[in-house]
């Protein structure tokens, strides 16, 4: 059986945390900031964790990633 390869696009978008979680960057950060409040823009700068529902699927894609 062949080895499972890392999904390279996913590996570039997610980072492993020390506890084994997955960190991701937020959406809605590329343009059209004039329609967002200062508070929204500030909060969009922070990264967030992958939700439990998506974690299993994404973990399989980036299985070999450290």
UniProtKB/Swiss-Prot annotation:
It holds the Pfam family Ribosomal_L35p. Keywords: Ribonucleoprotein, Ribosomal protein. One of its GO terms (cellular component) is cytosolic large ribosomal subunit. Residues 1-16 have a biased composition (Basic residues). InterPro entries: Ribosomal_bL35 (IPR001706), Ribosomal_bL35-like (IPR021137), Ribosomal_bL35_CS (IPR018265), Ribosomal_bL35_sf (IPR037229). Residues 1-20 are annotated as: Disordered. GO terms for biological process: translation. It comes from the Bacteria. GO terms for molecular function: structural constituent of ribosome. Belongs to the bacterial ribosomal protein bL35 family. This is Large ribosomal subunit protein bL35. It comes from Lactococcus lactis subsp. lactis (strain IL1403).
